[in-house]
Amino acid sequence: MARIAGVNIPNHKHTEIGLTAIYGIGRSRARKICEATGVPFDKKVKDLTDADLEKLRDEVGKVTVEGDLRRETTMNIKRLMDLGCYRGMRHRKGLPMRGQRTRTNARTRKGPRKAGVALKK
């Protein structure tokens, strides 16, 4: 298995698809990386030479991926929460922040339903 940016790339997949195993690299960015390095994107990962892998490692190193990207995203959300802006408050409350309705739906963001309060008769 090839190892790029601390991630094992599946051997049996094409280079373009295999690179998407790295957090922060999708199909379009993987294709651009392959074009920039001159590595054919439809070549299987197991068929790549050491020189090809080294070129890919260098090109992926120029992009923010994996832990750095996760940390950056977390810090952006934390900054919004510290500012106390609308989006930050919605993050803090665990509600959708892009204007979706919450009277019904929004179950993914709000979590499972809580038991309702029973009224006395």
Swiss-Prot record:
- Pfam families, per the entry: Ribosomal_S13
Q: Which domain of life is it from?
A: Bacteria
User: InterPro entries from the entry?
Assistant: Rbsml_uS13_C, Ribosomal_uS13, Ribosomal_uS13-like_H2TH, Ribosomal_uS13_bac-type, Ribosomal_uS13_CS
Give the start-end ranges of region Disordered.
91-121
Which GO-annotated molecular functions does the record name? rRNA binding; structural constituent of ribosome; tRNA binding
Any one GO BP annotation for this protein: translation
Q: Which GO terms describe its cellular component?
A: cytosol; small ribosomal subunit
Its keywords, alphabetically, are: Ribonucleoprotein, Ribosomal protein, RNA-binding, rRNA-binding, tRNA-binding
Report whether Cell division shows up as a keyword of the record: no
Query: What Gene3D superfamilies would the database entry show?
Result: 1.10.8.50, 30s ribosomal protein s13, domain 2
Tell me which family the UniProt entry assigns to this protein.
Belongs to the universal ribosomal protein uS13 family.
**Assembly and interaction partners:** Part of the 30S ribosomal subunit. Forms a loose heterodimer with protein S19. Forms two bridges to the 50S subunit in the 70S ribosome.
Function, please? Located at the top of the head of the 30S subunit, it contacts several helices of the 16S rRNA. In the 70S ribosome it contacts the 23S rRNA (bridge B1a) and protein L5 of the 50S subunit (bridge B1b), connecting the 2 subunits; these bridges are implicated in subunit movement. Contacts the tRNAs in the A and P-sites.
Q: What is this protein called?
A: Small ribosomal subunit protein uS13
Protein's organism: Cupriavidus metallidurans (strain ATCC 43123 / DSM 2839 / NBRC 102507 / CH34)
